[in-house]
Amino acid sequence: MSLDLSGAQLDQLRVFAGHLTNCCFDNASLLSTRLWGSAITDCTFQRADLRSSALGTGEWHGHRNTWQRVAFDRANLREVTFTAAVLDDCTFEKTSKQLMFVDCEIHDCTFTGQLSTLAIDGRGHRYPVDPSAISADFRDASVREFSIMGYRLDRVHLPRQEDIVVLHRYPTVLRNAAAWLKRPDATEAERRWSGMFDYTLGAPGAEDSDYCFDLNGYGDPELIAVASRALAHAHGASLT
């Protein structure tokens, strides 16, 4: 199906087993859209309003949502989730806050501009996913409160900013960092933040997977300093 729906009012759109090709949804209002088992190819959602939408909804009758060569540039993707979706050669430019990818396959996608509270979680707790199922380019992105967890990052070009931290085989590194913070001679600040990694360690990804994030996303200067020291010690411990 090929359609020009630019500027259309289509809030709470529901699509089951759809096949959309060469469709234009630029500047459309698509609040709380939901798709199941659908394939979207060569479509544009530039400046579309997709707030609170579920663009990946797991598996439906044996099929997942697939997005191939789709442009989401400057779309409002606030509180949008992709769960167990397959994305191939898609673009995301300055896509607002609280965009989340959970257990998706992400191939050759490009992220640019300011991106805030963007989380890419491949720990496989919602849907099985290969930790190598990601290749993406963030080199022209500026991120805040950003993370990629549970994937291997050898095919990911990360943002060019100094506060990006990359932890290879991150479960081991974080366990070492958590143990260091709880040592008997920890400082008062270290004791105060001793549980900072507990939530992440509560449901870790594969042992050989990675974790990257922007350190300044922690916000609190004391917390940033404590995290930096703990991770520096943990890196040394993980090599011994």
Feature map (PLM): residue ranges:
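Long, ordered, amphipathic alpha-helical scaffolds
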Residues: 154-240
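Tandem repeat scaffolds
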Residues: 1-175
